[in-house]
């Protein structure tokens, strides 16, 4: 039997932000269907415990415009709504929502505040959404290598390691002081 990871969500009139909190997720699989069917599964931990989420989203979504990104602590989904409007809840079933489903207050912006430019905490860190299309595949790919100008592709972890070893960061300051 599988377990359910904590799932947080927030929205704008045209997007739904879904964060699955699952550290060290492996074998990540995602299926998103146009009618709003959302399925996630992954394993985590030394015993490779299976975690799954199966949701019927409130309304239709644009699978081709939706994206996903995997980090070491969570899996983030940027789901494009088929119709630009605010949803009064995330899922179709009325009544009590699953205990693992929570509002992401760090990303939440009220409907009235959206026009004022309020974006909440929308810093996605080093998430790389390029090439991650949730509609064409059931699996999320490996970490994409970054170009740092030296012609050699590096993962984000390798780039961070270089900065810690004394290279200058974006502001021209040494990241590590002796």
Swiss-Prot record:
What family does this belong to?
Belongs to the p23/wos2 family.
Q: Which domain of life is it from?
A: Eukaryota
Q: What CDD domains is this protein classified in?
A: p23_hB-ind1_like (cd06465)
Q: Mind listing the UniProt keywords for this protein, alphabetically?
A: Chaperone
Complex formation: Interacts with HSP90 in an ATP-dependent manner.
A Gene Ontology BP annotation from the UniProt entry: response to heat
Q: Which gene encodes it?
A: P23-1
Keyword Chaperone found:
yes
What residues form the membrane-spanning segments? none
Tell me the function of this protein. Answer: Acts as a co-chaperone for HSP90.
Upregulation details from the record are: Induced by heat shock treatment.
User: GO CC terms on record?
Assistant: protein folding chaperone complex
Domain CS as annotated: residue spans: 2-91
The UniProt entry, under InterPro entries, shows:
CS_dom, HSP20-like_chaperone, p23-like
Q: What is this protein called?
A: Co-chaperone protein p23-1
Ranges annotated as biased composition (Basic and acidic residues): 157-178
* Ranges in coiled-coil conformation: none
Instruction: Point to the regions of Acidic residues compositional bias.
Output: 112-126, 136-155
Single GO MF annotation: Hsp90 protein binding
Q: Where is the region Disordered?
A: 112-178
